[in-house]
């Protein structure tokens, strides 16, 4: 997963940052480039989410949504870090790369609709303690992780 993801990201960045004279005219238009960037990021984000969820389910079982909890927290951390890095420090990052990472990858990687469904399922199973921990833990730790990510992003020079 890690090696393939790295290649996908490197190729995506290369595709989106190649010299304009080498790119067909149609690909120079933001109305084409932006959806391509989002799509490439979304593929990587969705696959990362899928494989991490499988790993957590195989490792810890399915009685508690550990994978979704981990994904939501790390996604918030990454979003905070990228926000601080891309918007506050490195304004040279192209709009396509920002879309690829923030909207595409992280948008597909962290979906709170799964969070809501998992909470609902735990409540339906009458597992109130786990449902309460999961519901509050995802929200509280997500907000804390955003803040930590921003702090870490601001520390990068």
UniProtKB/Swiss-Prot annotation:
**Subcellular location, record wording:** Cell inner membrane
Quick check: keyword Transmembrane helix in the entry? yes
Q: Which PANTHER family match?
A: FLUORIDE EXPORT PROTEIN 1-RELATED (PTHR28259:SF1)
Domain of life assignment: Bacteria
Q: What is its main location?
A: membrane
Note the Pfam families from the entry. CRCB
- Function, in words: Fluoride-specific ion channel. Important for reducing fluoride concentration in the cell, thus reducing its toxicity.
Q: Which GO terms describe its biological process?
A: cellular detoxification of fluoride
Activity regulation remarks: Na(+) is not transported, but it plays an essential structural role and its presence is essential for fluoride channel function.
Enumerate the transmembrane spans: 36-56, 67-87, 100-120, 132-152
Catalytic activity line of the entry: fluoride(in) = fluoride(out)
- Annotated Na(+) binding lies at 107, 110
UniProt keyword list: Cell inner membrane, Cell membrane, Ion channel, Ion transport, Membrane, Metal-binding, Sodium, Transmembrane, Transmembrane helix, Transport
> What cellular-component terms does GO give this entry?
plasma membrane
Specify the protein name.
Fluoride-specific ion channel FluC
């Amino acid at each position: 997963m890690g090696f393939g993801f790295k290649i996908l990201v490197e190729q995506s960045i290369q595709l989106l940052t190649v010299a304009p004279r080498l790119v067909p005219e149609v690909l120079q238009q933001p109305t084409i480039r932006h959806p391509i960037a989002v799509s490439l990021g979304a593929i990587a984000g969705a696959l990362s989410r899928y494989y991490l969820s499988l790993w957590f389910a195989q490792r810890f079982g399915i009685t508690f949504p550990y994978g979704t909890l981990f994904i939501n927290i790390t996604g918030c951390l990454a979003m905070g870090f990228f926000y601080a890095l891309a918007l506050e420090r490195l304004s040279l990052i192209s709009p396509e790369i920002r879309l690829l990472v923030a909207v595409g990858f992280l948008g597909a990687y962290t979906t709170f609709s799964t969070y809501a469904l998992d909470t609902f399922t735990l409540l339906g199973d009458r597992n109130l303690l786990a449902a309460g921990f999961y519901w509050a833990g995802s929200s509280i730790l997500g907000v804390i992780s955003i803040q930590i990510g921003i702090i870490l992003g601001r520390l990068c020079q």
